[in-house]
């Protein structure tokens, strides 16, 4: 499967699932983006069009983290979950953004669940 086919396949899956996954201020959308070397996660309120929280491997407080990519994703998910709980957010809607629920995406979700987020 060529790189173009993979990208267009992911975009189709993303477009299909976006109709079903909607975040509110009470239950925001946990959106995950995975690049080859980094991972980004955001809590988004789709009703108001605002990003509530964000965490990534590129943020300043995570620049000194060491470990495998999956371990870093679990840490990022845990940090995002703790920040969300501090703001009073307990339930979220998980948006895998067209990526398979496997590997780093699953590790981030597991880290967020360990922190106490419900989805």
Swiss-Prot record:
Region Disordered: start-end pairs: 1-23
Intrachain disulfide bonds: none
SUPFAM superfamilies for the chain: Translational machinery components
UniProtKB keywords: Ribonucleoprotein, Ribosomal protein, RNA-binding, rRNA-binding
Record-level Gene Ontology MF annotations: 5S rRNA binding; structural constituent of ribosome
Statement: the UniProt record of this protein carries the keyword ATP-binding: no
Gene Ontology biological process terms in this record: translation
InterPro entries found in the cross-reference section: Ribosomal_uL18_bac-type, Ribosomal_uL18_bac/euk
Pfam families referenced in this protein's UniProt entry, alphabetically: Ribosomal_L18p (PF00861)
UniProt key word DNA repair: no
GO cellular component: cytosolic large ribosomal subunit
Task performed by this protein: This is one of the proteins that bind and probably mediate the attachment of the 5S RNA into the large ribosomal subunit, where it forms part of the central protuberance.
Subunit structure: Part of the 50S ribosomal subunit; part of the 5S rRNA/L5/L18/L25 subcomplex. Contacts the 5S and 23S rRNAs.
Family recorded in the similarity comment: Belongs to the universal ribosomal protein uL18 family.
Name assigned to this protein: Large ribosomal subunit protein uL18
The organism of origin for this protein: Pelodictyon phaeoclathratiforme (strain DSM 5477 / BU-1)
